[in-house]
């Protein structure tokens, strides 16, 4: 097992996911442990470690991923009135595979990246 949930579990079929949209190169599915009432994850089917590497690996693939993010986000916004599109890099990125979260509604369960952000925000408010 690697630190890539998407290749190891979601894309391999080992973990069942509810598909929202799929193209030849991109999969969008409902998050298996959602942090928001609406929480969809968009991933390229080809493995690359992060968003930074995705651009270097293939600008066309990056465009195709963003196009699916755009379509999913438009649908979520239409249905729910608003949405967020989020991604994480570095230590905030739990799974070393580029992925975008398309979310709507109040945060119901903070993930590791959310906790890191909250801790940084708190320390900034407290001052040096």
Placement of each model-derived feature along the sequence:
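HIT superfamily nucleotide-processing domains
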Residues: 1-128
